[in-house]
Amino acid sequence: MQWTKVLGLGLGAAALLGLGIILGHFAIPKKANSLAPQDLDLEILETVMGQLDAHRIRENLRELSREPHLASSPRDEDLVQLLLQRWKDPESGLDSAEASTYEVLLSFPSQEQPNVVDIVGPTGGIIHSCHRTEENVTGEQGGPDVVQPYAAYAPSGTPQGLLVYANRGAEEDFKELQTQGIKLEGTIALTRYGGVGRGAKAVNAAKHGVAGVLVYTDPADINDGLSSPDETFPNSWYLPPSGVERGSYYEYFGDPLTPYLPAVPSSFRVDLANVSGFPPIPTQPIGFQDARDLLCNLNGTLAPATWQGALGCHYRLGPGFRPDGDFPADSQVNVSVYNRLELRNSSNVLGIIRGAVEPDRYVLYGNHRDSWVHGAVDPSSGTAVLLELSRVLGTLLKKGTWRPRRSIVFASWGAEEFGLIGSTEFTEEFFNKLQERTVAYINVDISVFANATLRVQGTPPVQSVVFSATKEIRSPGPGDLSIYDNWIRYFNRSSPVYGLVPSLGSLGAGSDYAPFVHFLGISSMDIAYTYDRSKTSARIYPTYHTAFDTFDYVDKFLDPGFSSHQAVARTAGSVILRLSDSFFLPLKVSDYSETLRSFLQAAQQDLGALLEQHSISLGPLVTAVEKFEAEAAALGQRISTLQKGSPDPLQVRMLNDQLMLLERTFLNPRAFPEERYYSHVLWAPRTGSVVTFPGLSNACSRARDTASGSEAWAEVQRQLSIVVTALEGAAATLRPVADL
C-alpha cells in the first residue's frame, strides 16, 4: 500500500532542504509553499460551505445506489473504480488515490439451495412456507444481484422443533421462558430485533438448548405499529410486510481469520475450526408478515405485556401451535440454512490531500462502501456526501487556491456490513503509524436517517469543534436557525460548565469508528441527520438493511431536495477544515472532565456502599479524577495564553500532540481480555446497570451474583486500579512536557 509513501513526501522534502528541526516540523519557510496556512482561513471555509451542492449529492446517490453492491461483488468493485476515477480527476481530484485489497472471510447464502423456513405437519409434509424473498413492489427488489435475506455467518443446518416466542432473545428472556415451565431443548425460538445484538440472540438461545433461531422486525419497533401494505413503502417510509433486515451475526469485528493482524497474504490465519464469534446454531431472519403467521398461531401462556407487539394478535409463548389455529397443533417449524463461508477480496480506497506544513498529522474522514442490497441510506448517503466534499476540496487544491496545514485522508471502507472489516484491517496494518499521527477520525456512514435535526456521537474532546462548526451553518428548512440552535431543540443536556447545550451520544461499535476509538484510542465522531423522536418510535429508519432501501425511498421520504445531506456535508466539511488548518488543534480535553465527574458520581452513589462492604475504597478514584480536572484546566489556560501571543511553532506542536494523544492514555489492552479489540477503559461495552466506568460497572454487576466469591471482588479491585492508573496517566500527559 502506497499511501504511507505519499504522506511522507512532505517529510522527505523537508529533510532535503535541510530544515531538520523535527519530523514533520511545521516551520517550513513560506517560500516552499506560499499556500501553507498558518491558521484556519475563514474565506476558504466560507467558499467550501458555498460550493457544497445538494444536487450533486443527489446525483452521487442515484449512481451509487443504482445497483446492489454487496461486499466483494462486481458492482462493489465497480464503485472502487468510480472512487479512484473521481479522486484522480485532473480538475477536482486529490494528490493521490489508491485501492488496497485484503483477502477476508465472508458469509453468503447458497444460490443453488436457498435458505427456507417451513411448517411441517404431523405426518412430515410441508404445510406452509415462509417467503424466501421480499416482495418486488418497485421493480428493484428482484433480480440475481439482490441477495436473499440471511444471517451472515450463521452456520448451516436444518433444525426442526416446536416454536417458542422469546421476545428479543436476551438472556433474561430465555430465563423467563424457563420460569414459565417451558422446556427449550430442541425448540425453534422466534425473536424480534432490538434489545441485544443480532448474534447474541443465537448465543443466548443455544445456552438453553434451543436448536434454531428466527428473527423478525416487529411493526411496533420500526413502523409505529403500522403494518398493512397501504400504510408502508412505497406509500410511506414504513417497512413493508415482506421486508427482512439482513445483517452480520458475527460477534466481533474485523476479518474472522486474522484477529489483530491485517488480512494480507503473509499473515497467519486461524484454522476455521478454531474461529470464535460465529452464531452457534442455525439462524434466519424473516419478514413480519411471516412472523405474524407463526406468532399469531402460537399456543401456550400469554406473553408478558412488555413482550407484546403490533402484529394484530395476542402474543403467546408456545411451545407449538394452538389447536384452533391455521396449523395442526403438533406441527413443527423447520429452519433450513445453507450459508457458506468464502474467502473473498475486499478493497479499501484512500484519497489523500498532503498537508503543507504538518504532513505527518492526519485528519481521517471515512465511510464504508458496501451494502446489503441497494443501500441508498446505508451507506450510500454517506458516500454521496464524501464524494461531494472531496470534489470541492479537490477543486480548490487543483486550482492552487488552498492546501491544508495537515494531511487529509478520505477513506472508503470495504466489507463493513460483515463486521467493520475494511476499517479494522486498515487499523491493524498501520497500527503504530495511525496511533502516532492521527489527529481525529470523522465517520459519516448513514448521513441522513431523516431530515429533522443533526445527531452527533463522539468522544468528549470533539464536542467543541462540532459546536463551533454548527453554530456557523444555517439549518435546512424555513427560518434562520443555525444547525446548532436547531439541534439543541431535539437533543440537549444541562452542562455545569456551558449551560444548555446539544448532547453528543457516545460511540459504541455500530460503524467504522469502532476500531479507531476502541483499538487505537483516536478521538472520533459520527455525524448524521436524523428524525424527530417525538414523532416516531422507530429504532432506526424502517427499511434498514432491506431491499427497500433505494434512491426513490430517500428522494421521496427521507430528504426531498437533499438539504439535510447538504447540511451534513457542510458540518463535516467545516469540522475537517478546522481540524486540518487550525494552528492550535480545536480539541478541548477539559470536556472530558464532565464525563469523568459524572462517572465518578454514579460510582459513588450506586456502588459506594457496596464497595465499602467489601473493603474497596473509591478514594484513589476521586483523587485521580480531581488530578485530571486540574491538569485539563491548566492546559486549557496555557493554550489560551499562547493564543494571545506569537508562540513558537514547536511549542504549539508539543501542545497539539498533548491534545491529540490524550485519548490514547485511556487504552489498556489487558483491561478486557474477553472483549476483542476493546481497550478503551472509558468506552468499552457496559453490561452493568450503573452508568459509570464500564470495567468497574461490569465487574460489580458480576460480583453481586450471590454465587460469586473472592475472585469476583478481586476483579472489581483490578478494574478500579485500571481506571485509576489510566486517569493518572492522562493527567500526566496533560502536564507541561518537561514535567514528569
UniProtKB/Swiss-Prot annotation:
Q: Which residues lie on this side of the membrane: Extracellular?
A: 29-740
Ligase: is it a keyword of this entry? no
State the tissue distribution.
Detected in small intestine (at protein level). Detected in ileum. Detected in small intestine, spleen and testis. Isoform 2 and isoform 3 are found in the small intestine and colon.
Keywords associated with the record: Aminopeptidase, Calcium, Cell membrane, Disulfide bond, Glycoprotein, Hydrolase, Membrane, Metal-binding, Metalloprotease, Protease, Signal-anchor, Transmembrane, Transmembrane helix, Zinc
| Glycan attachment residues as annotated in the record | 136, 274, 299, 334, 345, 451, 492
Which of this chain's residues are annotated to bind Zn(2+) 1?
A: 368, 378, 445
What is the activity regulation comment for this entry? Answer: Inhibited by bestatin.
Gene Ontology BP annotations: peptide catabolic process; proteolysis
Tell me which species this is from: Homo sapiens (Human)
Protein name, as recorded: Aminopeptidase NAALADL1
- Report the locations given in the UniProt record: Apical cell membrane
Q: How does it assemble?
A: Homodimer.
EC number(s) recorded for this UniProt protein: 3.4.11.-
Q: How does it sit in the membrane?
A: Single-pass type II membrane protein
Catalytic residues (positions): 416 (proton donor/acceptor)
Residue positions binding Zn(2+) 2: 378, 417, 545
